[in-house]
Amino acid sequence: MNPSTAQARVVVDELIRGGVRDVVLCPGSRNAPLAFALHDADRAGRLRLHVRIDERTAGFLAIGLAVAERAPVCVAMTSGTAVANLGPAVVEANYARVPLIVLSANRPYELLGTGANQTFEQLGYFGTQVRANISLGLAPESGASALNFSALNGQWRSATCRVVVAATGARSANAGPVQFDIPLREPLVPDAQEPAVPYAPDGRPDGRPWTYTPPVTFDQPLDIDLTPDTVVIAGHGAGVHPNLAHLPTVAEPTAPAAQTPLHPLALRMIRPEQVIMLGRPTLHRPVSALLADPAVPVFALTTGPRWPDVSGNSQATGTRAVTAGAPAQAWLRRCAEANRHAVDAVRGQLAAHPLTTGLHVAAAVADALRPGDQLVLGASNPVRDIALVGFHTADVKVRSNRGVAGIDGTVSTAIGAALAHERSGGRTVALIGDLTFVHDSSGLLIGPTEPTPRKLTIVVSNDNGGGIFELLEQGDPRFSDVSSRIFGTPHDVDVGALCRAYHVESRQIEVGELAGALDEDFDGMRVLEVKADRSSLRALHASIRANL
C-alpha cells in the first residue's frame, strides 16, 4: 500500500469511529486518496457520501447535515481555490457552532512558494474562524519499515481524534469548524496490487476511537429572582430551561418552542422589569430595544463559553438559572393578553390586506405544517415572517443559518437538513425568498448517483427582489427613485426554467393553494413558487403596528 492511500484510509476510518456519518466530497486530483477511501467506506455502508462539484454549496450542504444530525460532517476537497470556496460556510459554522470539518488535501509542503500548480498557503487560511488548524504531516516515501508504519498509524489516528474533538467541542463546550490539512504525495491512486477488500491499518478494538474524549460538562448556575416582572428572550442556540417555561417567552423560530409564548410585537404593550436572555437573539427590533434599555437588567444564559451582549447591558451570565420567587399572576395575565392581541393584529391585517406578500406565504406555510416536520427558513424575511405570524410548536424542528445570517447556501443547507431528517422518516419544508433561491440555485445540482431528498418541498416566496429592504430605512419613500434598483435588485428570473435546468419538479401556485399542495403525497424534491408583492410590505407592517 502506498503512503497516501494508507494515510487516507486511516483518516477515514478514524473519522467514522469519531462519529462522522456523512461526508461531502468535491472532485480533484490531489484529494484522490481521500476520495477512494471515502468511496470504499460508502460502499461498505460505514458512511454516506455526497459528491458535489461546487465547494461553496458543498460547505452549506454539510452544515445542513451537521445541524440536523447533531454530528460532525466533513467536506473534502483538493488544494487551491477549492479550499478558499469554503470560506462562507466556515464563517457560518463558527458563529452557529456547527461541527464542520474541512478536509483540505494539499501538495507536499516543500512545494509551497516554488510556483507549483494549484498551490498556496492554505493551512491556516481560515484564521480565527476555525477552532483549530491541524496538519497531518506528510507520509514517508514508499518502503518505510513496518515498525515506522505502525508508529505513523497511531500518530495519524491521534491527530484525527484531535480534529473531531475540536469540531464537536468535546473539551471546550464550543463546537465549530476545524481545518484538517493533509499533504499527499504521489502516487495518489491505490496500487495495482491492492486486495479486493480495502485494507486499513488497525484501530482500537470494537470500533472505538484511538483517543476517547468524554464530553466536557459546562455548568455555571446563576441565581435569578423571578419576583420582578420578567420576560424571557430566546434566540438561536438557546438551551432548554424547564424552570423558566412558565415565564412569558419571545422565542425566535430556531429556539426551543415556548410553552408560554409572547409575540415579539407584544413587547410594545408591556413594560418588563427584567429580561432573561437565552442563546443569541437577532431578529426583532423591539427585542433589541428592550435588551439595550439600561433600566432593564439582563441575565444571559448560554450553552457555551461565549455570550451575546450587543448593547453591553448584561448584568450576569451563566448556563442555567437557579430561581427564587415567583412572577405575579397579574403580570402573566397581562402578557398572555398582549400576546393574543399581537397575534390577532397580525392575522387580522393579513386578512384585510388586498395583495399577497411574503408574510401571507409564511402564514400559509406555518398553518400547513404537521408534527414531525422540519422547517428550514431563509435568513432574511422568511425567518422573521414565521415569527410574526405566531408560529410556535415543539413538534416541528426549525433550522436557519443564523450564525452570521447570510442568505448564501440556503438551498444547500435545506437539502442537507432534509437528507438527515429523512433518516427519522420526516418531511422537510423550506421557506425562502427568491433572491435566496437564485443565489444558491446551483445547490439544486445533484448527480444521478448521489443521495437525493425524498421528502423536500422548497417554497419560494417570489417578490422579485429584496423585500426586506422595504421594511428598513432604505425603503423610505423618499428613496423610491433609487432604492428599487440598488436595494430591491429585481432580477426577473424564471424560477420554473431554472428548476427544469436542474431536473427539479416545480410549479407556480397561489397562496390559497399552498396548504393543499403541502398536504399532497410527494416523493422527491420539488419547488413551489408563490408570486408575492413587496411594494405594499411597508404599509402592511405599519397597519399591524397601528392595530396593536
Swiss-Prot record:
GO biological process, one term: menaquinone biosynthetic process
InterPro entries registered for this protein in UniProt: MenaQ_synth_MenD, THDP-binding, Thiamin_PyroP_enz_TPP-bd_dom
Functional pathway: Quinol/quinone metabolism; 1,4-dihydroxy-2-naphthoate biosynthesis; 1,4-dihydroxy-2-naphthoate from chorismate: step 2/7; Quinol/quinone metabolism; menaquinone biosynthesis
Key words of the record: Magnesium, Manganese, Menaquinone biosynthesis, Metal-binding, Thiamine pyrophosphate, Transferase
Cofactor list: Mg(2+); Mn(2+); thiamine diphosphate
E.C. numbers: 2.2.1.9
GO MF annotations, alphabetized: 2-succinyl-5-enolpyruvyl-6-hydroxy-3-cyclohexene-1-carboxylic-acid synthase activity; magnesium ion binding; manganese ion binding; thiamine pyrophosphate binding
Cofactor note: Binds 1 thiamine pyrophosphate per subunit.
Top class in the EC scheme: transferase
Catalytic activity: isochorismate + 2-oxoglutarate + H(+) = 5-enolpyruvoyl-6-hydroxy-2-succinyl-cyclohex-3-ene-1-carboxylate + CO2
Top-level taxon of origin: Bacteria
Keyword Flavoprotein tagged: no
Pfam families with a match to the protein in the record: TPP_enzyme_N
Subunit architecture: Homodimer.
Stated family: Belongs to the TPP enzyme family. MenD subfamily.
Described purpose of this protein according to its UniProt entry: Catalyzes the thiamine diphosphate-dependent decarboxylation of 2-oxoglutarate and the subsequent addition of the resulting succinic semialdehyde-thiamine pyrophosphate anion to isochorismate to yield 2-succinyl-5-enolpyruvyl-6-hydroxy-3-cyclohexene-1-carboxylate (SEPHCHC).
Protein name stated in the entry: 2-succinyl-5-enolpyruvyl-6-hydroxy-3-cyclohexene-1-carboxylate synthase
Name of the gene: menD
